Amino acid sequence: MHRIWICFFLLALESSISTIAQQTAYAKFSSAPAVSTANILASIVGGVLKLPVGKVLNIWGRAEGLCASLFVYILGLIILAACDGPSSYAAGYVLYWVGYDALYLILQVFIADTSGLRNRAFAFAFASTPFICTAFTGPLAGQNFVDNTGGWRWAYGAFCIIQTAAFLPLAGVFKYYETKGLKMGLYQKERSGRTVMQSLVHYFIEFDGMHVFLLIKGISHANMS
């Protein structure tokens, strides 16, 4: 549980620092009004994609879902750290937010998997305590990054390393217990028997790809108009 708490803490801290870095970045780009556009788009895409992310966890496994989400999250941070304009920043921010939401969902699913119904509310409350302290310490750390640690880009670059070091061991723990469960016969993996093309069609239907796309497009148009 302590490792889960650390991961929640790092997500909360990075999110708080990112707020300061974002304002500084758009000020440098002389494109401050684009902040709200990037935030709206990232929130819509990240929120809608929670639906297929939950499906990924059930089909591929917790460890695989965590690694895929971490990859998207880190890729977004790298683009944010290396971007040269508001458009590339917005693209990186969408990837970053999709990965962030997915990682947060996976941690919540793990808590639900490992806690009893009687203690689940307490477990979720305990895991959310980092957001209390980072609400005050995060902006101070973000301002320190901007003023004394090489600028706002390092606010993102540093967490590429920190988050990878924090989350990859957790994926290893997930995989270890999954393998242990297989050896103990607690559950069995069955081969699908589908071809590659059949698998693509199957997963597109399972993840409800068309409706996810239409939902993102519809909500985006409604918020941008």
State what each model feature region is:
Residues T24, L51, K55-I59, N144:
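Membrane-interface helix termini in secondary transporters
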